[in-house]
Amino acid sequence: MLELKNVSKQYGTKQALKDVSLTLPRGEIVGLFGENGAGKTTLMKCILGLTSCRGTITLDGEPIFRKNITRLSFGTSEHSFFPGLNAKDHRIFYEDHFPSFSEKRFQVLMDFFALPEGRRIGSFSTGQKNQFEVVLALSQGADYILLDEPFAGNDVFNREDFYKVLLGILEPSETVLLSTHLIEEVSDFISRAVLLHQGQIAGDHDVQELEESGRSLMDVIRQTYQYRSDRVLQALENLSDVDGPF
């Protein structure tokens, strides 16, 4: 179990995270939602030890250090691969450094995304780079897979097909923490939704329980973030007042 207790992070005068407590058991697909700047990426980086923070983060009761960090993997739109290497070079590197690396899963995902194995990753398109990030994160053999906006630069058809493949290849013991703005697309396959607002947990919902109560995840998110459906009309009216009729 991955557990966070009272995790806080501050950048200068900006409070990026404030007293975040969260438990992630094995075998869940958890959606992490929030506005831009809500703290989603910072939270993942704190879990992985990529940035310092206050509070405690443990994996099965133990702090996350070198001996258990390989149980976590990370796919990020900021990219963590070696741009000068090709896919084959990455496969060899991961086989040498991650004992649980799955060559079969790596190859299945490479074929699924139709990624060229001999080309330098730095020459890939943005969408291909993000796809390769996902390939590495899912092939590492980690128990906890953290994906931060993994679908940027990918069209809706690629995304929909990938969701199906993801559900098909995950083992029951693997946990995915997925940060995305594509709420409606992922609401059908995530089991839980964690909502961040201004660096704090604003909601933690079982998706099935929401559906049974007659509410959708989108309804809850709109309510949590006080979405104003009239703001588009108001903006157009304000423009019309300033500039005259279009």
Question: Where do the protein language model's features map onto the residues?
Answer:
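Catalytic Walker B motif of ABC-type/P-loop ATPase nucleotide-binding domains
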Residues: I145-E149, N154
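The feature captures the beta-strand-to-loop junction immediately N-terminal to the Walker
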Residues: F33-E35
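ABC-family P-loop ATPase nucleotide-binding domains
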Residues: T76-F132
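ABC ATPase nucleotide-binding domains
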Residues: Q208-F246
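Conserved ABC transporter NBD signature motif
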Residues: G55-N68
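Helix N-cap at the start of a conserved alpha-helix in ABC-type nucleotide-binding domains
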Residues: V156-N158
